[in-house]
Structures are given as C-alpha cells and as structure tokens.
Amino acid sequence: MILLKLYLTLAAILCQSRGMTSLDLDDLMTTNPEIQNEIINKHNDLRRTVDPPAKNMLKMSWDNIIAESAKRAALRCNYKEHTSIAERTIGGCGVWEKILSC
C-alpha cells in the first residue's frame, strides 16, 4: 500500500513539474533513467540549499542495487528498520531506510 501512495504522490509531483495534463504511469517508473535523473537532480538541488552549507557534501547518484534494496524494504512494510549491519551495508556503503507509514 505504501508503494502505491508513494508512486501516486511521485506521479502527481512529476506531472506538475513537467506540465503534463494526463498521467502515463509507465513514464514515471523509477526504472526509467529520465525519472532517476530527475529524482537525483532534485535531491542534489535541495541538498545544495542547506543552511549552513555542508562541508564536503558528496553528490548523490542513482544505484540500482540500493534501489532494489529500498523496494524490498517497502514491499515488506513491517514498520521496522533493519537492525543488522549486514542488512544496512550494500557494496561497502552504509544505507538506512525508514518506512514511516503503510
């Protein structure tokens, strides 16, 4: 259920930002590289506006393995965070996700 809520919210936001009048959900899938770039660019734009500015803030980029991990966590939707370090490490990088509501 949370995926549907997130998907519809993202669809509405992206439609408005693109000036679209009709909704084609296939064009808004996060498997679409254009959508991935739009999400990453918006995220990086917002991060650049933090005040006070961060020192040495790395630019975020899309990672399909981490995206799949986030998808699996959302599909589980059991209101708990991963607890083991192994579950929170992908490709040597620490990751964390929170499911706020389902």
UniProtKB/Swiss-Prot annotation:
The GO molecular function terms of this record are: calcium channel regulator activity; potassium channel regulator activity; toxin activity
Ordered alphabetically, the record's keywords are: Calcium channel impairing toxin, Disulfide bond, Ion channel impairing toxin, Neurotoxin, Potassium channel impairing toxin, Secreted, Signal, Toxin
A single Gene Ontology CC term: extracellular region
The record, for SUPFAM superfamilies, names: PR-1-like (SSF55797)
Please name the InterPro entries in this protein's record: CAP_dom, CAP_sf
**Where does tissue-level expression of this protein occur?**
Expressed by the venom gland.
Task: Tell me the ranges covered by the SCP domain, including all copies.
Answer: 41-80
Report the protein name in the record. Answer: Cysteine-rich venom protein VAR9
Report the locations given in the UniProt record. Answer: Secreted
